[in-house]
């Protein structure tokens, strides 16, 4: 069994294009889970609304129309496309910088560091502003007097109004929890994927510069998604609260953590874990599979 890896630098443009296509496809397919997760995180503790994500999706679609579960979807797709492109570009670039100069191997620790760097990069460049728009739109849709929905102004004008109202500081409010979440997400997700992929390649004596089969890639990506959800959910909940329309009630990220814990309890940090699990399991499988396939096509 070979213990050596062939160093394979990924072309930056190919990495960005493959990541962007994977991100766009994943966003279109999994958005209802993202919608349900965000709504569950915004539901008041005293509310009698169902906490079952499938029931929430069904009732929302039934009472408000199927389009209601895609509120904020355009912003999410654009953000996810940019995010995934930046993520894989950053990960592959940092990964190649951290490889062992003699063997081309990337240790588990270095894989986590590469994921951490990619997560920080994507959080500032793409995730924070687009997540702020998505969260505000979902929150606004459920309010008694929606400002950015059902006003006859159209999607583009409503999005523009929201961006103007929030301003730069509003779009980047919550950048700390977003950066913490994305850094943790990608450190766990990409680090886990890279490590398991390497173990499989070592076990099967497969070349390190070739992707796994589509089935294995999907399974490894899905498993990485499961690990990511439960280890980073508290950061995701705080991020959502800091980007909601009521975010001004929290003076800082730490104050948000403390307030949720004091007023709603520890379990609240994992509210929305089930739909997020559904999305990230699918997301992990879809993103890594499409990414690997597109890289092969572009090679």
UniProtKB/Swiss-Prot annotation:
A single GO cellular-component term on record: mitochondrial inner membrane
Subcellular locations according to the entry: Mitochondrion inner membrane
Domain of life (superkingdom): Eukaryota
GO BP of this protein: mitochondrial citrate transmembrane transport; transmembrane transport
Bilayer disposition of the protein: Multi-pass membrane protein
Transmembrane segments annotated in the record for this chain: 16-36, 66-86, 113-133, 174-193, 215-235, 272-291
Main location: mitochondrion
One MF annotation (Gene Ontology) recorded for this entry: tricarboxylate secondary active transmembrane transporter activity
Keywords tagged on the record: Membrane, Mitochondrion, Mitochondrion inner membrane, Repeat, Transmembrane, Transmembrane helix, Transport
Matches recorded under Pfam families: Mito_carr
Solcar repeats: 10-97, 109-199, 212-297
Keyword Transmembrane helix in annotation: yes
InterPro entries: Mit_carrier, Mitochondrial_sb/sol_carrier, Mt_carrier_dom_sf, TXTP-like
Function according to Swiss-Prot or TrEMBL: Transport of citrate across inner mitochondrial membrane.
Family stated for the protein in its record: Belongs to the mitochondrial carrier (TC 2.A.29) family.
Protein name according to UniProt: Tricarboxylate transport protein
Chain's gene name: CTP1
């Amino acid at each position: 069994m070979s213990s050596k890896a062939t160093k394979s630098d990924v072309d930056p443009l190919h990495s960005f294009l493959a990541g962007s296509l994977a991100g766009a496809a994943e966003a279109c397919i999994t958005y209802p889970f993202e919608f349900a997760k965000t709504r569950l995180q915004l539901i008041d503790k005293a509310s009698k609304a169902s906490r079952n994500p499938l029931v929430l999706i069904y009732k929302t679609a039934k009472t408000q129309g199927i389009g209601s579960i895609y509120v904020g979807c355009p912003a999410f797709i654009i953000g996810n496309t940019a995010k995934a492109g930046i993520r894989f570009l950053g990960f592959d670039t940092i990964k190649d910088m951290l490889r062992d100069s003699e063997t081309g191997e990337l240790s588990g620790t270095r894989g986590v560091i590469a994921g951490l760097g990619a997560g920080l990069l994507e959080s500032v460049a793409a995730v924070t502003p687009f997540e702020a728009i998505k969260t505000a739109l979902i929150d606004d849709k459920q309010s008694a007097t929606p400002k950015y929905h059902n006003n006859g102004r159209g999607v583009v004008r409503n999005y523009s109004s929201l961006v103007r109202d929030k301003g730069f500081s509003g779009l980047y409010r919550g950048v700390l929890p977003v950066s913490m979440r994305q850094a943790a997400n990608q450190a766990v997700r990409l680090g886990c994927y890279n490590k398991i992929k390497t173990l499989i390649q070592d076990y099967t004596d497969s070349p390190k510069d070739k992707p796994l089969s589509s089935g294995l890639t999907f399974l490894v990506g899905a498993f990485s998604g499961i690990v990511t959800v439960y280890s980073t959910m508290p950061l995701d909940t705080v991020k959502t609260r800091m980007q909601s329309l009521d975010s001004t009630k929290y003076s800082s990220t730490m104050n948000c953590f403390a307030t949720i814990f004091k007023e709603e309890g520890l379990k609240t940090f994992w509210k929305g874990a089930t739909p997020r699990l559904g999305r990230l399991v699918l997301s992990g499988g879809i993103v890594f599979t499409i990414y690997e396939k597109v890289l092969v096509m572009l090679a």
